[in-house]
């Protein structure tokens, strides 16, 4: 295939180097420099302070402080399956920046990179994906499982290496209020994305989470767009899917917090392409918790795997023809004081030289339509396709 991939972006500052971590959120936005130590310990059982993951994390923070790093942070990504190696590291230093100023500078960015797509492949193809959805929907109508999240990929090969810093600027310009991230990986690649979903933020003893489940495509007409949002809010199918997520999260968080506040009904939030049902959680964590114990407790939520978790992940393993790896995982940071912020690794891409892999998923329940879920994942993929100029 010989598709044009032109980047019409604006530059006011140098782009981020591919070996630097970048995280932009309403709570804290920062970049990092250098690498003190990589940390690939699997996050399995990471919700326990006594787990190997948490014990080794604490030891690494102590080492960093002993070497003169005053306020060490652990940054990076944890895969969908926490039994797999983590992609985390402690940088030598970090630098805060203004989210508002970065939003403005990204809109003014003028540097361009022209690339050609030489190959583009959907994994799986549409017919196979729709068969997967039909099978999963049938299973969710049985006592075995209530919800399954199925995903698909797009692999793209370009004629030259891709500048992740240029893409990051365009991603921010197009998705200014998302949780934007750029994660350097040990293999030389980069995980880049604009997540709409906060898994866990912890500041002192207070924590928050805003799970998303249930979505609808935005419309260009303002009246039709609002109608689409209202239909989503009234959708029995989407409300059921959303409630499976929030109920599961409430059950596990109650035991780990002295306070927990959860609205009885979801609200609407938007991205440039989608409406989402969202429920904001607020709470006060027990004293032994840190941002990563709580993030690992929740991850993966039923919004990324399904419910019940074990049955849903078994269906995913049987139906999806690929390993999700970091997709559907979590991205963020945690400091040595237990504060941190972790978002769900969606609306994202993995880049390495001239190779790109995009990811999107959808929650499957008995009322799911195979064609409808193909289209929904297509809208979700459009977030990153738009960044590449492939509408």
From Swiss-Prot:
GO terms for molecular function: isochorismate synthase activity; magnesium ion binding. InterPro entries: ADC_synthase (IPR005801), Chorismate_C (IPR015890), IsoChor_synthase (IPR004561). Pfam families: Chorismate_bind. The keyword Metal-binding applies. It catalyses: chorismate = isochorismate. It is an enzyme of class 5 (isomerase). Gene3D superfamilies: Anthranilate synthase. Disruption phenotype: Cells lacking this gene are unable to produce enterobactin and are hypersensitive to the antimicrobial peptide wrwycr. Changing residue 346 to L: Loss of mutase activity. Induction: Under conditions of iron deficiency and by the fur protein. Its cofactor is Mg(2+). Isochorismate binds at residues 214-215, 241, 303, 347, 361, 380. The active site is at residues 147, 197. Its EC number is 5.4.4.2. It comes from the Bacteria. Pathway: Siderophore biosynthesis; enterobactin biosynthesis. Mg(2+) 2 binds at residues 241, 376. Binds 2 Mg(2+) ions per subunit. Keywords: Enterobactin biosynthesis, Isomerase, Magnesium, Metal-binding. GO terms for biological process: enterobactin biosynthetic process. Changing residue 303 to T: Loss of mutase activity. Mg(2+) 1 binds at residues 140, 142, 145-146. Belongs to the isochorismate synthase family. Involved in the biosynthesis of the siderophore enterobactin (macrocyclic trimeric lactone of N-(2,3-dihydroxybenzoyl)-serine). Catalyzes the reversible conversion of chorismate to isochorismate. Monomer. Forms a specific pairwise interaction with EntB; this interaction likely facilitates substrate channeling to connect the EntB and EntC active sites. This is Isochorismate synthase EntC.
